[in-house]
């Protein structure tokens, strides 16, 4: 099943990957990403744990209707969440680089 040293190499790779994943999780938790909507009139910043850190609303929107402002805030939150997910996937791809993972295997994020 495993060639000469195959199991040992597999265990070594698994431990290295676990260490890299731990380091990556710590880095991702520190990330902050800003999502925007309305051409930058609404900005929402979230961290790697998807917690909202900041909401910025252009003063010109305070005069417009409430429904539009609510829609722009929701769109900015969704944009920020999408951006943090993309960043996490990119970082995790670098961790698993070289590992032969089964098709469809998902990292723990």
UniProtKB/Swiss-Prot annotation:
| Alphabetical UniProt keywords | Cytoplasm, DNA-binding
Q: What does the subunit comment say?
A: Homodimer.
The text of the family note is:
Belongs to the YbaB/EbfC family.
Source species, domain of life: Bacteria
Q: Where in the cell is it found?
A: Cytoplasm, Nucleoid
Show the coiled coil region(s).
Answer: none
Q: Where is the composition biased (Low complexity)?
A: 11-21
Which Gene3D superfamilies does the annotation name? Answer: Nucleoid-associated protein YbaB-like domain
Matching Pfam families: YbaB_DNA_bd
Spell out the molecular function terms from Gene Ontology: DNA binding
State the function annotated in the UniProt record.
Binds to DNA and alters its conformation. May be involved in regulation of gene expression, nucleoid organization and DNA protection.
Q: What is this protein called?
A: Nucleoid-associated protein Spro_1136
Stretches the record annotates as Disordered:
1-21, 90-109
Q: Where are the transmembrane segments?
A: none
For this protein, the record's InterPro entries field holds:
YbaB-like_sf, YbaB/EbfC
Q: Which organism is it from?
A: Serratia proteamaculans (strain 568)
**One cellular component (GO) term of this entry:** cytosol
